[in-house]
C-alpha cells in the first residue's frame, strides 16, 4: 500500500466526548451529491471512542511545510500539545479547523461501516474553508512529498 500516494490530513473533532485529532492518509471523496468524504479510523486507536461519540469531524488537508504537524498528530503526543502547535478556528460543527490548512472540510458522520480492524466513517460535508494558494503535501512510499504547483 505504500505505493498509493495520498493527501496528508489531520482529522479533528470536539464535542461531548472531548477534543481529539490524528493524522490520516486514508481519506477520499465519495460523492458530490450530497458532498461526502470517507475517513478510515482503526477501532483500536486511542481517539476512536472520541470520534465515535462526537459524530462530527473536520478533515484538514495539509500543505507543504506542515510535515512536523503531521508527525505530531501521528504520534503519541498528548492532545493538548498537538493542538497547541498550530492555530485553530471553530467550524460550524464545533470541530477545530486548522487555519493554515490547504482546505478544511467540516463534516457530520452520517454512516459507519466496519471492515476488518477499521471503521469507515462516511462524512457529510457541511462547510468548506480554503486557504489562498498553498502547495499540497502527499504521502508516498513512506515519505512526504511537496506538490510542485499550487494545488488549488
From Swiss-Prot:
GO biological process: nitrogen utilization; uracil catabolic process
Annotated keywords: Flavoprotein, FMN, NAD, Oxidoreductase
Induction pattern: Up-regulated by the nitrogen regulatory protein C (NtrC also called GlnG) and repressed by RutR.
Top-level taxonomic group: Bacteria
Gene3D superfamilies named among the record's database cross-references: Electron Transport, Fmn-binding Protein, Chain A
GO molecular function: FMN binding; FMN reductase (NADH) activity; FMN reductase [NAD(P)H] activity; riboflavin reductase (NADPH) activity
Signal peptide extent: none
Substrates-to-products reaction catalysed: FMNH2 + NAD(+) = FMN + NADH + 2 H(+)
Top EC category: oxidoreductase
Pfam families: Flavin_Reduct
Coiled-coil stretches noted in the UniProt entry, renumbered to this chain: none
EC number(s) reported in the record: 1.5.1.42
Record-linked NCBIfam families: RutF
UniProt record similarity statement: Belongs to the non-flavoprotein flavin reductase family. RutF subfamily.
Reported function: Catalyzes the reduction of FMN to FMNH2 which is used to reduce pyrimidine by RutA via the Rut pathway.
Protein name: FMN reductase (NADH) RutF
Amino acid at each position: 500500500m505504500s505505493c498509493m500516494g495520498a493527501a496528508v490530513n489531520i482529522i479533528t473533532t470536539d464535542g461531548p466526548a472531548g477534543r481529539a485529532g490524528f493524522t490520516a492518509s486514508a481519506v477520499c471523496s465519495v460523492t458530490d451529491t450530497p458532498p461526502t468524504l470517507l475517513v478510515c479510523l482503526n477501532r483500536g486507536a486511542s481517539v476512536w471512542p472520541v470520534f465515535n461519540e462526537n459524530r462530527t469531524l473536520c478533515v484538514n488537508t495539509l500543505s507543504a511545510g506542515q510535515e512536523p504537524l503531521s508527525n505530531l498528530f501521528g504520534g503519541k503526543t498528548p492532545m493538548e500539545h498537538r493542538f497547541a502547535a498550530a492555530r485553530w478556528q471553530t467550524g460550524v460543527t464545533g470541530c477545530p479547523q486548522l487555519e493554515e490548512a490547504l482546505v478544511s472540510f467540516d463534516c457530520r458522520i452520517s454512516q459507519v461501516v466496519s471492515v476488518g480492524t477499521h471503521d469507515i466513517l462516511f462524512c457529510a460535508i457541511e462547510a468548506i474553508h480554503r486557504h489562498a494558494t498553498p502547495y499540497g503535501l502527499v504521502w508516498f512510499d513512506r515519505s512526504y512529498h511537496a506538490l510542485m504547483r499550487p494545488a488549488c
